[in-house]
């Protein structure tokens, strides 16, 4: 198993100033955003082993500390210090933007909303671009290894120091939405948005992008559909296309069947085509139902990575056209609630997540699952509110998320892992929580 320890301090300041004015059928806004964000962050990583049982126990193993000049074997519970993607960055980013919007009622039935935003972006950050390895840390030091032929201990000097990276860029965004009411209750709507940005300070916490990898991220969105409204139903159905270019991600690649892992920096694209239908239903006084259904197909584009392990073995992963891991293709939300009185409310929440892939190459997956919640909220008076929440009241069991160390496993190899224990995240168990809020 792997554990990351994070330490960070964030300071930020945000202010918005806006002017608005109506001119005939136009509702105009003109504004300025100023946002300052300072980050001082670092993390470290380690690995450990535990028994597989109801109450797992930490296990001891034999390991060699690469910082030990004698390379003596030690009996330890943790090992592989900072082998896997420890992070560090310190610096700030500042965004100063001018934006405008216009809500234009062209005719009583036809509405056009459009706007734009231009942002000056400045970033100053410390970056450590050196590849990570066991015993990695800031400073001047040696690591030690043993020559396989002679048995001699070899000292390798390292000098790990952060370097300052400063960027000054312009980002932009634009949006256009058109709505046409065919009747008082039924209408059509379509909108498009494009937004851009450059890599942010947090993306320099790992090895960070090189100058060649520092590219503009572009996010276009196009959607269209229809809506229907009356006094008890608000129904919307939309088809959406969205993509994102030049994503930056650190991926930990583990050699299958071993504990050895390497971290690589990836730059790739994602695109999604989906259909979403949502409804807000109020059939009688006090009762409300929110319902949503989504079918989507998020896929990787230009996703290729390769890694060389300590024994010289080279392995690669090609996720082009694969479904994005951890993202289900089918989503369902059902949220009924009932106000017994104006101060007493009962509610339930059902979330269905369809089949979800647990690794990059669609080799391992989790079956669909329901996550359920329910509760009661009581506003006793203007000073006191009480609540009770039940989590997972259907007592669903299983795993979700990803499976550590599985990224290089292919569909052809997946059968080799049938019946094996693999680590991941578990569904939150049946839980009852009570809360109280006091206002003065």
What is the predicted function of each stretch?
Residues 10-12, 22-25, 29, 33-35, ...:
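Structural signature of Gram-negative outer-membrane beta-barrels, strongest in the C-terminal barrel
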Residues 1-3, 48-84, 124-165, 205-210, ...:
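Solvent-exposed loop segments that connect transmembrane elements
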Residues 15-21, 98-104, 176-180, 224-230, ...:
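Residues on the lipid-exposed face of transmembrane beta-strands in outer-membrane beta-barrel proteins
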Residues 220-224, 288, 321-440:
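Conserved C-terminal beta-signal and adjacent last beta-strands/turns
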Residues 196, 298, 393:
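Hydrophobic pocket-lining residues within nucleotide cofactor-binding pockets
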Residues 108, 120, 241-243, 265-360, ...:
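Gram-negative outer-membrane beta-barrel transporters
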């Amino acid at each position: 198993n792997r554990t990351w320890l994070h330490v960070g301090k964030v300071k930020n300041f945000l202010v918005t100033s806006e002017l608005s004015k109506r001119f005939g059928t136009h509702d105009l806004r003109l504004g300025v955003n100023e946002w300052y964000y300072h980050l001082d962050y670092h993390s470290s990583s380690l690995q450990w082993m535990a028994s597989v049982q109801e109450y797992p126990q930490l296990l001891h193993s034999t390991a060699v500390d690469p910082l030990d000049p004698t390379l003596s074997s030690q009996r330890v519970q943790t090992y592989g210090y900072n082998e896997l993607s420890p992070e560090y960055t310190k610096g700030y980013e500042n965004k100063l933007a001018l934006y405008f919007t216009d809500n234009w009622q062209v005719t009583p039935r036809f509405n056009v909303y459009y706007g734009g935003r231009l942002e000056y972006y400045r970033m100053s950050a410390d970056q450590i671009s050196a590849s990570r390895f066991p015993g990695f840390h800031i400073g001047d030091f040696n690591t030690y290894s043993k020559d396989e032929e002679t048995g001699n201990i070899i000292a390798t000097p390292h000098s790990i120091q952060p370097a300052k990276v400063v960027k000054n860029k312009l980002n932009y965004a634009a949006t256009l939405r058109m709505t046409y009411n065919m009747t008082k209750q039924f209408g059509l709507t379509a909108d498009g948005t494009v937004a851009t940005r450059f890599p942010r300070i947090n993306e320099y916490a790992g090895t960070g992008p090189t100058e060649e990898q520092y590219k503009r991220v572009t996010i276009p969105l196009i959607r269209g559909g229809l809506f229907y409204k009356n006094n008890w139903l608000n129904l919307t159905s939309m088809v959406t296309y969205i993509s994102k270019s030049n994503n930056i991600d650190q991926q930990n690649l583990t050699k299958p069947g071993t504990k050895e892992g390497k971290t690589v920096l990836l730059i790739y694209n994602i695109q999604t085509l989906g259909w979403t239908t949502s409804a807000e239903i109020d059939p009688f006084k006090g009762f409300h139902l929110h319902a949503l259904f989504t079918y989507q197909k998020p896929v990787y584009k230009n996703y290729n990575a390769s890694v060389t392990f300590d024994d010289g073995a080279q392995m690669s992963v090609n996720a082009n056209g694969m479904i994005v891991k951890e993202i289900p293709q089918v989503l369902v939300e059902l949220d009924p609630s009932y106000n017994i009185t104006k101060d007493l409310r009962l509610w339930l929440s059902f979330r269905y997540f369809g089949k979800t892939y647990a690794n990059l190459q669609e080799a391992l997956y989790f079956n669909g699952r329901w996550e359920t919640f329910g509760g009661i909220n009581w506003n006793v008076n203007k000073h006191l509110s009480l609540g009770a929440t039940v989590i997972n009241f259907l007592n669903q069991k299983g795993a979700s998320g990803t499976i550590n160390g599985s990224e290089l496993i292919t569909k052809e190899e997946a059968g080799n892992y049938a019946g094996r224990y693999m680590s991941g995240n578990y569904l939150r168990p049946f839980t009852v929580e009570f809360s109280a809020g006091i206002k003065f």
